[in-house]
Amino acid sequence: MTRIYGIILILVKFIQTTTPIQICDIGASPVDKTEFIEILLDKTNSNIIGFEPNKDEFIKLEQSSKKKFFNYAIGDGKVHNLNICYAPGMTSILKPNYEYLKLFHKFDEWSEILKVISIQTKKLDEIYFDNSLDLIKIDVQGYESEVIKFGDDKIKNSLVIQTETSPIPLYENGKPFSYVCNQLENLGFNLHMFSKIHNRSFKPMIFNNSIYSGLYHLFQLDCVFVKNFKEIDELDEENLKKLILIMFYSFKSYDFVDLLVSKLEVKTKKNYLNQYRDLVKTLKMQKLY
């Protein structure tokens, strides 16, 4: 057993793919860690192609034979203004929703627009990839719905979508969690889990001596959408294996993986389930919420 990034991982050697898992990172700024991607790159046969429009953040990205990044935005294919904010993680095509953000600590500072640059966006569906996308991460600060709208063909043919949304939009003209959820459900996905739940406290209250802590209010949700069960039953062996590896390494959804492995066993007539369950007995599991 190896402890990496604070969690216990064991390599699933008995489940291997013949083609790489293709990851697509839309909004690839390194300002927020993406451990769920790094683990997959480290532990499986996988590659990543990413897109980041903010030049200052783009130049921080590490390129390699497995990591290719491009300095442009994914969207509706039109020219837009990119609002560069004081906090790089708040930079967006959309303008911050100041009336809402001012209710919380520090966001009036973090959301300040320092400069505006004109950018040409590209539709996800118009970008050529050597292979179909398996895991798509969308972190575009309120612009998720447009990425999905103009990338629905690529998205509906993928396996897992990880996206950051908010029940109440943090940006003007942004769509709420419910809207994005409906978009992805219409493309054959179900909401499986929240990989992170971000709470914030309303000013002036502070919890745990930290402005980053909240009591109950749901500020942002890192959502994991997975192919619905009908779609899963129609996956071929290769894609089912990819889904298993993504859900095992990236999201630690061990009971769901058990279900997927049982489906793989039926499909291939090979004994995977006993090996997997022996492996699971050695894992230390912890609920996120």
Located regions from the model:
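Phosphate/nucleotide-binding beta-alpha loop and adjacent structural elements of enzyme active sites
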Residues: 1-289
